[in-house]
Regions:
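Polyanionic, low-complexity intrinsically disordered segments
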Residues: 107-117, 124-214
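Amphipathic, oligomerization/interface secondary-structure segments
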Residues: 3-121
Length: 214
């Protein structure tokens, strides 16, 4: 997977304390939502300015980037993607997997059914005991880990940055860049007009991901 996703997953896998492991799961889900939002916005932006309604819908949550708002933005962006999107997997992933995982059953927003409720309990519940954390982890570990095999399509996208020596690929949890031998046609050159830019590449598809540098 691209490094922005692989790193929090590695932290989750290596963590042994149940409270910290729950937090690591929350971090991984939030970063996944961010990546999906930025990919979707990038794909839409390639076609011109974002639709005005979508711009209005995103204005508040993008200025208040909490997990619940990232979930809302992911759904809004997914619903705005056209049929010929370069990301055909994104909308069904958000609709069929992430939204049910985060929201849980309607009218049953409890910490054992809604991942958003779990995140809010961790953040605002005044702390939890190790015993309770272990119980919650036993409940959430299977559905959390079942999400990630559905992300394999993201591994097909190369997350590329420009370096002094050319280009490097952000892949896996390693701190170093992989070599990325790319030619530089005009669209690629334009996408890297910012030194800190990040570009997602898949075949002849190119999506600028500048928000990942924030």
């Amino acid at each position: 997977l691209p490094t922005p996703l692989a790193l929090p997953l590695r932290d989750y896998q290596q963590e042994t304390h149940p409270v910290l492991k729950l937090w690591a799961a929350c971090d991984a889900v939030e970063i996944l939502l961010r990546v999906l939002v930025f990919l979707g916005i990038g794909d839409l932006s390639r076609r011109g300015e974002l639709p005005e309604q979508l711009r209005r819908e995103l204005r508040y949550p993008i200025e208040n980037p909490m997990l619940g708002n990232w979930r809302r933005m992911a759904q809004q962006v997914a619903e705005a993607l056209p049929e010929d999107t370069a990301l055909p997997e994104l909308s069904p992933l958000v609709r069929d997997n992430l939204v049910p995982f985060l929201d849980g059953p309607k009218r049953r927003s409890s910490v054992d059914r809604s991942f958003l409720a779990l995140r809010n309990r961790l953040a605002h519940g005044g702390g939890i005991s190790r015993r309770l954390a272990a119980e919650l982890l036993a409940n959430w570990q299977p559905p959390f880990e079942a999400l990630w095999p559905r992300m394999t399509w993201l591994a097909d996208w190369a997350f590329v940055i420009r370096t002094d020596g050319g280009y490097g690929r952000l892949r896996g949890p390693r701190p170093t860049l992989e070599p990325c031998g790319l030619t530089t046609p005009e669209p690629l050159t334009a996408a890297f007009s910012s030194v800190d830019g990040v570009v997602a590449l898949h075949g002849d598809q190119l999506i600028p991901l500048w928000p990942l540098t924030l």
